[in-house]
Amino acid sequence: MALDELKSAIPDFAKDLKLNLGSVIGNSDLPQQQLWGTVLACAIASRSPKVLRELEPEAKANLSAEAYTAAKSAAAIMAMNNVFYRTRHLLSDPEYGTLRAGLRMNVIGNPGVEKVDFELWSLAVSAINGCGQCLDSHEQVLRKAGVDRETIQEAVKVASVIQAVGVTLDAEAVLAE
């Protein structure tokens, strides 16, 4: 199993990450589609080749073709939106917030899977990319759809652990050169 290979690659000094990776994926209360879509979208957002290579096959095996594509779409559109909306939020001039975005985001309206799943994946990617405005927006949509805070936090835990594993393994690869 690729998850076991990924866990075994984590150095001893990051044992907490190894344990957390096993628990957030192996013991998650999220339904399979939500879990593996979150895993795939976050593996992409982590920008870690090792993490993506190890987690993608299992994600693909646990997702329908539509969900697999939608999770990749969530990572792609959030890569754009998180930069755009984080910048608008951080700029001191509030007038930027009144300007039309002018960016295509059609996939958000028609992701090819349940809207709640896509929103959850988008929220998790937004956590990795650090866009508070996007986090708030996706959290509000999820809460209005009846998603509880525990489910939202579970997706954020998956995001945080995958990101930390990616940073750790990529740093170790560089230091080993």
UniProtKB/Swiss-Prot annotation:
EC assignment: 1.11.1.28
This protein's record includes keyword Oxidoreductase: yes
Enzymatic class: oxidoreductase
Oligomer status and interactors: Homotrimer.
Gene Ontology MF terms in the entry: alkyl hydroperoxide reductase activity; disulfide oxidoreductase activity; hydroperoxide reductase activity; peroxiredoxin activity
Protein family membership: Belongs to the AhpD family.
Residue ranges crossing the lipid bilayer per the database entry: none
SUPFAM superfamilies the record matches: AhpD-like (SSF69118)
Gene3D superfamilies: AhpD-like
Gene behind the chain: ahpD
Pfam families: CMD
Function: Antioxidant protein with alkyl hydroperoxidase activity. Required for the reduction of the AhpC active site cysteine residues and for the regeneration of the AhpC enzyme activity.
Residue pairs linked by disulfide bridges in the UniProt entry: 131-134
Reactions accelerated catalytically: N(6)-[(R)-dihydrolipoyl]-L-lysyl-[lipoyl-carrier protein] + a hydroperoxide = N(6)-[(R)-lipoyl]-L-lysyl-[lipoyl-carrier protein] + an alcohol + H2O
Keyword terms, alphabetized: Antioxidant, Disulfide bond, Oxidoreductase, Peroxidase, Redox-active center
Stated name of the protein: Alkyl hydroperoxide reductase AhpD
Catalytic residue positions: 131 (proton donor), 134 (cysteine sulfenic acid (-soh) intermediate)
Keyword Oxidoreductase attributed: yes
Coiled coil: none
Lineage: Bacteria, Bacillati, Actinomycetota, Actinomycetes, Kitasatosporales
A single GO BP: response to oxidative stress
